[in-house]
Amino acid sequence: KAAIEELERAVTGLGLKGAELDTIVNGENWDAARFLPFFKAAEAMGAVLFYHPQPQHNFLTERTTRYGLFNSLGVILEDAIVVAILILGGVLEACPNLKVCIAHGGGPACYAMGRLDRGWQGNAEARRSIPRAPSSYQKQLYYDTVVGSEAALRFMIDQVGIDRVVLGSDWP
């Protein structure tokens, strides 16, 4: 309830377009049932939810402490996981008009969509919350351009379309 009130204050009171969220909240994934009212409220407000991982919450923290891997790989893996959670957890099915943008071009999510589809086909748990293959939801999301290379950007555009890509920057 407090998160809904704060989002409403930000959007209606302050004139902001939405909110930036971490890819995990207090150790819980975003497909937890208790977050659905928040998503429904954001959808009703037309608010944009921008997901950007925080390195300290990286699920691979112990394995990415060297070589700057927490930033170069850890955060993009978090991006891909939040894409999968929002899709497979049924959030995008329950809120088809929800405006969600994923940092770093969604990490490797676009590249891995075929694997998510195959996993969905062969796993009853994966099919529980969504009636269609995961790839059919990927164009409901927006992705920023902080992908690291022109080739990655071109691949992402080919997968989701230019109308789902927004300018991004890791610099203020």
Model-found features: residue ranges?
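Active-site mouth loops of central-metabolism enzymes
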Residues: 1
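Active-site metal-binding loops of divalent metal-dependent hydrolases
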Residues: 170-171
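Catalytic cores of alpha/beta
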Residues: 5
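Catalytic pocket-lining loop regions of alpha/beta-barrel enzymes
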Residues: 11-166
